[in-house]
Every structure is written in C-alpha cells, then in structure tokens.
Amino acid sequence: MTEMKILIVTLTYIEKSIIDEIVNNLSSYGLEVDILLDSRKYLPISAFNWERLQYDAEKVLSFLKSIHDFNYDSIIFLADSDGYIDGYNFVFGLTIDNFAIIFLHRLREEFYNRKPDLDLFMKRVVKEVTHEVGHTLGLSHCNTTGCVMNFSNSVEDVDKKQAKFCKNCAHKIEKLSKYLQQK
C-alpha cells in the first residue's frame, strides 16, 4: 500500500512546535510526512530583490526544483522570509508542479507591529502549508467557506479559514490517494 508522501524542508530556522503541528495536521489526512531540518538547501541570493527586500518566489522555487533529488509526491520548502511574485506585493506561498514554498514572514503578528503570538503564528503556518500541499496534489482554490483551499489575499483571510480541507477537497485527495495505492 502506497501512501502519498510529503517532504517538508526547512530553509531557515522554524520552531519545532510548528513543525509538529504541520505533521499532525497533514497526517490526519493519511499523508506520510517526512521532515528535513538540515537540508543544506538555501534561499539563493540571486533571487533576492534588493529594491523590494523580498525574495522572488518563482526564482527561488525554480532554483530549488533544479537542485532537488527527493522522491516525494509533494515537496514543501519553509522559509521565515518575505516573498513575492510579479504583479503582487507579496505571497504567503507558491506552488509549481509538486513543489511549493511558504514564506512565513507576513504570518507573524510582529510584521504588523502587533504583539508576538506564537499560537496564532503556528495556526497560520499550518493553514498555509496545508493549502500549498493541496495545490501540489492538484487542488485549485475553493470557494467553500472556511476551506483551507480558500485564496488568501491578506493575513485576515488566512485567519478566516480553517486548517482543514472541506468535504469536497478532502474527497479529491482521498481519491488521489486510492489511485496511488493501486499503482
């Protein structure tokens, strides 16, 4: 029996409690999750935009894809940095094929000059990681209220959604998992 395998790769220091919550949430969908904390992968300086003081998410992900050697259904990179794509002021995450990167900087309360809140930060990170995993597994944005696959244009949008897939999105993942088990 083959489970869908997810690899989480940290590119910067991420608190262990956050990693544990990510694993717990994804495992609840029957996904096998591995963690690579000391990946020797990094954010390429060539992808840093010095005028914006942000990483170009497409350049970062293209670079990481080019040097990967992992055999997983979904590979998620985490960076406690700020990212953007052309046409947007920022992105929380970006997915290309089965690779995704999540930028954590704007998920922190401190970014908005508010008091640090590790619990809220953890919830936001889990939601955005789950969202990007959904994209790597073929899900698109969902309009079902509260679904983790809702598009988030702001941290308030992240706060409105839950850390779980709606029934329809969960069913799609279950169907994919059953298909992979038959291979």
UniProtKB/Swiss-Prot annotation:
One of its GO terms (molecular function) is zinc ion binding. GO terms for biological process: proteolysis. Zn(2+) 1 binds at residues 131, 135, 141. Zn(2+) 2 binds at residues 142, 147, 166. The active site is at residue 132. InterPro entries: MetalloPept_cat_dom_sf, Pept_M54_archaemetzincn, Pept_M54_archaemetzncn_arc/bac. Keywords: Hydrolase, Metal-binding, Metalloprotease, Protease, Zinc. CDD domains: Peptidase_M54. Binds 2 Zn(2+) ions per subunit. One is catalytic, whereas the other seems to have a structural role. Pfam families: Peptidase_M54. Its EC number is 3.4.-.-. Monomer. Belongs to the peptidase M54 family. Probable zinc metalloprotease whose natural substrate is unknown. This is Archaemetzincin. It comes from Saccharolobus solfataricus (strain ATCC 35092 / DSM 1617 / JCM 11322 / P2).
